[in-house]
Curated annotation (Swiss-Prot):
The lineage of its organism: Eukaryota, Viridiplantae, Streptophyta, Embryophyta, Tracheophyta. Gene3D superfamilies: 1.20.1280.50. It comes from Arabidopsis thaliana (Mouse-ear cress). It holds the Pfam family FBA_1. This is Probable F-box protein At5g47300. PROSITE patterns: FBOX (PS50181). Residues 40-86 form the F-box domain. Disulfide bonds: none annotated.
Length: 416
């Protein structure tokens, strides 16, 4: 890269920092040097491929601030090929989100000094079909590539939402399957694309499966041979590198160990993945994702308070997946960990953040709780207030510019 383009790169980075609130004094000093350069050098001088290489390495949350400053950049940010390239190359802005009382909140988690967690802001999803622009009440949420698949409590409304760009796509629901997952695959015609998998429930044989293809905008039933049953330790699977993962058990041999099963949206097939150790059942089991690279499981066997958090090797790098235990804690007896718990883990700092729901003696005495637990078994509890609707759900999120609302034709069809 020539010095000329290095200066342009510096200019772009400074512009990004200015838009996201960098120190004004520093910017003034830097901009005094750039003013003269800008008089003789315009962004139009920058070759398109080099501009892409620069911008695809700037975090999505920073790029969205620049959308309105340059028509050329705005067109680029709307280009599907660029947004996919950006997803692959841009630094990951890892965030923690929580679904609580039908709303999604951004969470700040700190392990320095006294561990703390707090909701910093609400990510508002406006109901496009409401005359008064009411907020959409979310019952389930599923994350993949910076997109959130959200459903309502009655499973009559489905929307794919990008909180970073604010764009949405509303989808006709499947009337026969009430649980949903979301993943990506490589389409020969469209490139990277997305599908929604719906299934009829947990814990029994002959679970119906249906697929919604974003490109064709239609549902179809999935005729696939399975030898396992999806187990309801939690209402949510997790997405990692386009695949969805759940807990499962053998369809014929019910006494065999519980395992993980993944769904590949390209081949539309299931594949088994062994857990760290064999166990026919767990008191508590939950899945999470670590930095968009690894799977994590929280496992608590029956009749014990010992809870273990295991993390895999990087998914996709080798055919064989290995497990490492990063944390083992004995939860206090007064902390009753339920199967519906969701969690995040910091493998380096040896902390786990759990989110569940407390039920009091009064049917209206319910509240959402977040627990921070470290190697010393000390539990810090944060009360997030009275819960009136959905079970709280804590999950990882990485903002992106990915969009699925342009250039896809096809007539919308409904599964009856």
């Amino acid at each position: 890269m020539t010095r000329k383009y290095i200066y342009i790169y510096i200019y772009i980075i400074l512009k990004v920092r200015a838009r996201v609130g960098a120190n004004n004094k520093t910017l003034i000093n830097n901009q005094s040097h750039l003013i003269e350069m800008r008089n003789t050098l315009m962004l139009s001088d920058l070759p398109g491929d080099l501009l892409e290489e620069i911008l695809c390495r700037v975090p999505a949350t920073s790029l969205k601030q620049l959308r309105s400053t340059c028509k050329q950049w705005n067109n680029l940010f709307n280009n599907g090929r660029f947004t996919r390239k950006h997803l692959d190359k841009a630094p990951k802005d890892f965030q923690n989100l929580m679904l609580s009382d039908s709303r999604v909140f951004s969470m700040s988690v700190s392990f320095h000094g006294i561990p703390s967690v707090e909701a910093t802001c609400e990510l508002s999803l406006i109901d496009s079909f409401s005359s008064f622009e009411d907020k959409f009440e979310i019952s389930q949420v599923f994350h993949c590539d910076g997109l959130l698949l959200c459903t309502d409590a009655d499973n009559t409304r489905i929307v794919v939402w990008n909180p970073c760009t604010g764009k949405t796509r509303w989808i006709e629901p499947n009337n026969r399957c009430y649980y949903y997952a979301f993943g990506s695959y490589l389409d020969k015609s469209y490139g990277n694309s997305y599908k929604i998998l719906s299934y009829s429930g947990y814990g029994y044989e002959n679970q119906e499966l249906a697929i919604y293809e974003i490109n064709s905008q239609s549902w179809r039933f999935l005729d696939v041979t399975r030898d396992c049953i999806l187990e309801r330790y939690t209402d949510y699977g997790v997405s990692l590198k386009g695949h969805t993962y759940w807990f499962a058990s053998d369809e014929k041999e019910k006494n065999l160990s519980v395992f993980l099963v993944s769904f590949d949206y390209t081949t539309e097939r299931f594949r088994r993945l062994r857990l760290p150790y064999q166990c026919p059942d767990y008191n508590t089991a939950s899945l999470s994702v670590v930095r968009e690279e690894k799977l994590a499981v929280l496992l608590q066997r029956e009749n014990t308070s010992r809870t273990e958090i295991w993390v895999t090797s990087r998914i996709g790098e080798t055919k064989v997946v290995s497990w490492s235990m990063v944390l083992a804690v004995d939860f206090p007896s007064e902390l009753f960990i339920l199967s519906g718990i969701s969690f995040l883990v910091d493998a380096e700092k040896k902390f786990v953040v759990c989110c569940d729901n407390y039920f009091g003696e009064d049917e209206y005495d319910t509240k959402n709780l977040v627990h921070i637990v470290g190697e010393n078994n000390k539990v810090r509890e944060v009360n997030f207030g009275v819960s009136e609707s959905s079970w709280p759900f804590l999950f990882n999120y990485v903002p992106s510019l990915i969009q699925i609302w342009e250039g896809v034709g096809g007539k919308r069809k409904r599964v009856e």
